[in-house]
Amino acid sequence: WESGLSTPELPLIVEMADFFDTSIDVLLGYILKDNRIDATARRLRHCQRVKDLNGLEEAEKALKKYPNSFIIVYRSAMLYQALGLYKRDNAKLRRALELLEKARPLLHQNTNPRISEQTLYVAMAEISQDLEDDERALELFRQHNTDGLYSDCIGMILAKDAKRAQEALPYLSESLLIHEAALVRTVMGYLNLFLNSRDYAQAQALLAWALPIFTAMPRPECTSFMDKINSVFYLFQAHVLLKTGQPEDARTSAEEAHRLAVRFDAAPSYAADTIRFAMPGEDSTVNDDLGETAAQATQNALKQMDDPQTTALWQEMCDAR
């Protein structure tokens, strides 16, 4: 065989591959396109990301080859959804829905913790909405709206209908509060990241972007828990400005931090309806771990900064009261 004088029969090739503990393709020196399930799923995911229409042909081929593979069916559905939206092609969107339905009973095969039954139903809701089947979309979003996760989608759909606009308000209000709280936490996370790495330029850019948003959140006519939160952010901004050689701007930020802290502690309120656009009479309240009072929150922030210059500036603000 090595000299090319003869070719063994197929059963013998199989036995030889088994004997040498290798695969037949390696034994034959033959490299096939990598069509294993995981590799195929990765190619479909890539086609989805780059919106490659040629991926649909590979998806259909893979679906014939692996009709009962969850990851193949799911990735094919996601590809059809992405391209259906991209091309405004309802036929592709309907195919995506069909594949998502097929994926549901195969979910037990899934090993990706980021994909769950809820993932499938929410994708179906999104596609239903894109197909203008709002009632089906609402039904699915409502069934899976754990902790208000999809209140924004529900509120948006309801608000399109003038007759149901008031029905949308509780959902929009809930979503507003959820996402504003998430934004505050995210900004605080980034701020800690930049401060710990002493990247004061990035910290300054972050606060310059975030503070106008945060200061616009509370209703101006009443005290809000956002005053307490913003007092801490303004104090951090003063710290960053000191570190970047801007003492006058730092003083202005420290003065605003002190003003907001005094304002909050004079009439503290954690009521959710102190936020602009929140539903009037919203009976939920907001919690934070900054400190019992705004004064305590700023002291905790100073401990975190551990910077004598910022502490001295803050003490000056307090003494001037």
Predicted regions, residues:
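Recognition helix of helix-turn-helix/homeodomain-like DNA-binding domains
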Residues: W1-T7, G29-Y30
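Hydrophobic micro-packing sites on short alpha-helices
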Residues: P8-L28
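Generic helix N-cap/helix-start motif at coil->alpha-helix transitions
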Residues: D34-T40, N68-V73, P113-Y121, H144-C153, ...
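Helix-turn-helix repeat elements of alpha-solenoid scaffolds
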Residues: R45-A59, K87-P105, A125-R136, L158-P170, ...
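Flexible helix-coil transition and linker loops at the boundaries of alpha-helical arrays
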Residues: E60-I71, K102-E117, A137-R142, S175-A181, ...
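Structural signature of alpha-solenoid helical repeat junctions
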Residues: N68, R75, K92-R95, N112-S116, ...
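Short coil/turn linking the two alpha-helices of tandem helical-hairpin repeats
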Residues: A77, A82-R88, T111, E132, ...
